[in-house]
């Protein structure tokens, strides 16, 4: 498993930990070093952007995990 795959897996775990009803669709590759991620809950959908470096660092960096968690929480709250 490479760094991006590990980060994407950790992202999915993070989303499920916040709200199991939310489905996240993460592209396999970033566009311009940014991941455009779709979060769906029922009929509601939000898009968020996460930098490639943050996805790579997500499993190991607590401050990155905290920032990404805040972005995801804000998106879920807006659904």
Locations of the language-model features?
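Short amphipathic beta-strand/extended segments with alternating polar/hydrophobic composition
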Residues: 46-53
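Negatively charged, low-complexity tracts enriched in Asp/Glu with abundant Ser/Thr
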Residues: 1-26, 56-79
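Amphipathic, interaction-prone secondary-structure segments
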Residues: 12-46
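Generic hydrophobic secondary-structure signal
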Residues: 37-39, 50, 72, 77
């Amino acid at each position: 498993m490479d760094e991006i795959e590990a980060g994407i897996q950790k992202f999915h775990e993070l989303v499920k930990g916040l709200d199991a009803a939310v489905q996240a669709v993460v592209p396999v590759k970033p566009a311009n070093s940014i991941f455009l991620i779709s979060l769906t809950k029922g009929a509601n959908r939000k898009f968020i952007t996460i930098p490639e470096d943050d996805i790579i660092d997500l499993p190991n960096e607590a401050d990155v995990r905290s920032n990404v968690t805040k972005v995801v929480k804000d998106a879920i709250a807006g659904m």
